[in-house]
Amino acid sequence: MKFLFGLLLVSSFAFADCPQLYPDHKPFNIPNTTELCNSFYVSDYDTINHKVIAVSELLKHNFPVGSVKRTNNFHSDDRVGSVPNNRQYLKTHYDKGHMAPADDASSLEEMKETFLLTNMTPQSPTLNRVEWKLLEEKVRGIFDSSKTDVYVVTIAVYENKQTINGLPIPSGYWKIVYADNSQYFFYADNNDDAVVVQRGSVALPSLFK
C-alpha cells in the first residue's frame, strides 16, 4: 500500500526506531518531534510545545484487537518528563482523547501504553464520547473484515494555537485507514457540534503549526 501524503514522508534512508509501525515502513517528516515507539503504535510528539502531532498504529491480522478490559489508568510518559500530566486536564471542559484508541489494544501491555498522556489531546467531550467513538468502532469493523494487517494514522491539526493549562488544543483530527490496498479518510472538528465526515483522497491542511 502507498502512503499518499508526501507531506508526511521522508526518504527511505531516514532513521526510525520502529519503522514497522508506519505505513510503507516510512517515518513521518514532522519537524521538532520525538518518535515515541510503543508495542503497536508510534507517536510523533512535539516536546517543545507538548503536543502529539500524529500517531500510527499497526493492527496485526488475527490479533485479538479489542479483547482487553479497559483500565482508565492515565499516566505521564517518562520519556518526555512530567508534562503532560493529569493535573493539566483538571477542571477543564476537555476529555483526555485517545489518538490510538484503548479498544485497539490486544494485550494488557498495549492497553497500558494507550493511556500514556503522550497519546492524548484535549478533546471535546461530545466528540470523544459519541462521534469519535463511533468512528473508532467503524475502523475496528474495517479491521475485522480485513484479510491483511491494517494501519491507522490519526493526525491532530493545530490551526488556532489555542491552549488550556499549557496543553495545545487541536482544532480538528484526521484519521486515515489503510486496509486491503484501500484507503479511508475521515475528518472531524474538535468541538461539541462536530460530525465525522468521510472523504476521498484529500489535500491535508498544514499539520505542523
What would you call each of these model-derived segments?
Residues 14-16, 23:
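Boundary at the C-terminal end of the N-terminal hydrophobic targeting segment
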Residues 78-209:
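Domain-level detector of nuclease and nuclease-like folds
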Residues 3-13:
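Sec-dependent N-terminal signal peptides
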Residues 19-20, 36-38, 47-54, 169-171, ...:
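Coil-to-beta-strand transition motifs
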Residues 34-95:
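Short, His- and charge-rich active-site/binding loops that engage polyanionic ligands
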Residues 25-30, 38-42, 138, 172:
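Short alpha-helical segments and helix-capping/turn motifs at coil-helix boundaries
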Residues 31-34, 165-167:
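Short Gly/Pro-enriched turn/cap motifs at secondary-structure boundaries
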